[in-house]
């Protein structure tokens, strides 16, 4: 294979985008020539550009115009002509007709894939990180249908994800590969560096005997930020006499309406000194490496990177069943899996771990071991390169 075209939806610091970044680094190490098309920018853009050329999809000149202006332009066919010119310019810049293989990262990227008119002979690999909720939020049915119809091989991050695309979208299971890319050596190094940094909670004024229950992820309903606060209320209420007060820290909540709503709940629940919302930061591991328990409150998460980060920090995970692929890794020895949205059960398991330090250590260490056993980075990249070679030879 000579040239690989990668398509991503943006460069925000989130799970799928970080996986793509790690993938690009490993592919570059294999000498693969790449170009990346992004639907939008973000904090990771410079890191992407350090690996390969990056093209941001251009916006229409009149995209910010008033609705009436757009309607008039549409009737005159101006926008349609602009779109055609833009598509052709992007195709020429990417030299689409000479690309050997296309890798589409996330179904959201199907929007830009559909505008490129990729030649029928070019194999397409789609790396899916989304389940039902995210598919409905971040993709359109016709764009997803087109993407899946052109997909030669589907990379699914978990069994739950593979099952969803097979049974809800009729994708051929013989063309689905279970694939999770975690750059475990780099992540282990980053964890080590984070642990060597000064205790960030001391600078926040936490008591030295505090136990930290952590959450991490974007601020959105799907991630269960609201459930995290309810969980904190239950745990604190059931553990009033503890000599080790539990503090709840969620990393990844930016300023905005949702943050304001969450802070209102926190204040009204009397938890202002126990629940702490941290904005998105590249220093996630400084917080996570000192968590005592990680709770995945997501209503849906296919196979989130944060669970791998927690595991390599030797932090046990408590998550919901039927909310994605995390139970496949956590199982019965890396933490606890509780019934979907059962916060009573989740709070009981969290308290169990907080009260039993040896159990915390045993489960956290075992979770880290399973990650290293099941997801070695070298094997993962070799699997992908072999797949690329097979598809480009057909």
Feature names for model-found ranges:
Residues 280, 299:
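Aromatic "clamp/platform" in nucleotide-sugar-dependent glycosyltransferases that forms part
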Residues 37-43, 183, 216, 245-261:
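Glycosyltransferase donor-sugar binding loop
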Residues 260-279:
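Nucleotide-activated donor-binding/catalytic signature segment of Leloir-type glycosyltransferases, i.e.
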Residues 345, 352, 359-374, 380-386:
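A short, well-ordered alpha-helix in the C-terminal region of glycosyltransferases
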Residues 316-320:
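Short hydrophobic beta-strand element within catalytic cores of glycosyltransferases
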Residues 56-57, 149-167, 171-195:
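Donor nucleotide-sugar binding/catalytic pocket of nucleotide-sugar-dependent glycosyltransferases
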Residues 17-22, 211, 215-237, 260, ...:
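A conserved mid-protein helix/loop that constitutes part of the nucleotide-sugar donor-binding site
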């Amino acid at each position: 294979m000579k040239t690989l075209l990668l398509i991503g939806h943006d460069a925000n610091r989130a799970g799928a985008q970080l996986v793509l970044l790690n993938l690009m680094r490993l592919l570059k190490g294999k000498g693969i020539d790449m170009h990346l098309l992004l639907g939008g920018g973000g904090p990771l853009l410079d890191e992407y550009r350090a690996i390969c050329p990056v093209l941001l999809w251009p916006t229409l000149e009149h995209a910010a115009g008033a609705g009436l202006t757009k309607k008039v332009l549409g009737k005159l066919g101006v926008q349609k002509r602009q779109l055609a010119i833009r598509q052709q310019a992007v195709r020429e810049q990417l030299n689409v007709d000479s690309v050997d293989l296309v890798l589409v990262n996330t179904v959201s990227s199907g929007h830009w894939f559909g505008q490129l008119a990729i030649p029928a002979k070019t194999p397409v690999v789609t790396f899916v990180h989304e389940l039902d909720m995210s598919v409905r939020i971040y993709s359109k049915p016709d764009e997803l249908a087109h993407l899946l119809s052109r997909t030669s091989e589907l990379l699914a991050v978990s069994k739950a994800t593979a099952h969803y695309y097979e049974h809800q979208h009729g994708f051929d299971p013989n063309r689905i590969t279970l694939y999770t890319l975690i750059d475990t050596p780099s992540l282990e190094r980053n964890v080590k560096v984070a642990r060597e940094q000064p205790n960030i909670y001391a600078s926040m004024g936490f008591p030295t005997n505090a136990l930290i229950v952590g959450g991490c992820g974007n601020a959105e309903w799907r991630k269960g930020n609201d459930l995290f606060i309810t969980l904190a209320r239950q745990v604190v209420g059931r553990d009033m006499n503890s000599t080790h007060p539990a503090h709840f820290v969620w990393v990844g909540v930016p300023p905005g309406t949702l943050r304001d709503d969450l802070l209102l709940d926190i204040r009204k629940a009397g938890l202002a000194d126990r629940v702490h919302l941290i904005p998105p930061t590249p220093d996630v591991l400084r917080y996570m490496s000192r968590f005592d328990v990680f709770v995945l409150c997501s209503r849906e998460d296919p196979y989130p990177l944060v669970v791998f980060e927690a595991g390599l920090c030797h932090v046990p995970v408590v998550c919901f069943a039927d909310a994605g692929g995390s139970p496949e890794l956590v199982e019965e020895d890396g933490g606890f899996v509780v019934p979907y949205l059962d916060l009573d059960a989740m709070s009981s398991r969290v308290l169990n771990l907080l009260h039993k330090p040896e159990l915390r250590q045993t489960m956290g260490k075992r979770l880290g071991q399973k990650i290293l056993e099941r997801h070695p980075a070298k094997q993962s990249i070799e699997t992908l390169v072999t797949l690329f070679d097979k598809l480009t030879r057909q």
